[in-house]
């Protein structure tokens, strides 16, 4: 770590993927940056841990697809800088009924943005993917750019490069107080720091930090069951067999997504894009009825559509989502203190977009014009935003 005083150009709270990319962009631009993390690294308490995430350009909204174009470039740049593979192209298969409006919207977005994709009829699907069973006349959309990000490796690479660039990462330091002003003061369990600007990327702990600053965002913290299902024939749903990532759009009340067997030999990762509302400090409490219901939905999906997998998960892990009502991010400055920047509400789809999110948060913290239109991400879009203390 570089030797620094306790005064910084910027302090970033939260060393998940969004905070790491924010600190990365700050350090890249020769800013003195302190990245604070309440837990000792690595940890599995938040939203950025685990071996894999889906990367894709397939979105209903043009603005995400446009952001993803730059994200792919930055992910590739990070791979070169780290000297290690962080991404594998597998393609992404989106599944839905022929009438599904979401599938049509995504196809239109990919066409407008010039993204390589392919529409697959029911007949095409059965020929192309014999190890998937199609029971409802499903059609498919293949995002040729889709693939897998190696999440834990990416976090380690970023934290290492931040330090190489002169930034400082302090883990095991929980923030206990933020005093607004110029400079802003951040007090942790160990000491106090000051900076010209502060970026808060604290995931499910965001509102705990914001409440004393007079605002509360409409964030729902969800506990997600991350399930791994054993192949009956090893390798049949693996990366080596060119099996794609999958995203089921209307095969359950919420999306179901799957990643080819990779991190656990012979186990495919399949998850339900929903969970039950829990406090992040209580995520390890006994399972609720909602948990059981979520896993039952996945069991039915696997039994109906993936006959080459055992019908019950072999491994179940936990992850946290922090959702906004519209499932779009919050990237904005505090309405009263413009040197406090907030990145929150990544709603279970933020990891792949972190290279551009970090760039935007860096720009906001340095009072630079943002590279993208931030209208979809302003906190003012929520009428329920509490400003009781402003």
Swiss-Prot record:
Pfam families the record matches: DAO (PF01266)
Transmembrane annotation, as ranges: none
Biological processes per GO annotation: L-lysine catabolic process to acetyl-CoA via L-pipecolate
Cofactor note: Binds 1 FAD per subunit.
UniProt binding sites for FAD: 9-39
Residue list for modification S-8alpha-FAD cysteine: 319
Keyword Cell inner membrane: no
GO cellular component, one term: peroxisome
PANTHER family, alphabetized: PEROXISOMAL SARCOSINE OXIDASE (PTHR10961:SF46)
Function text: Metabolizes sarcosine, L-pipecolic acid and L-proline.
Protein name, entry field: Peroxisomal sarcosine oxidase
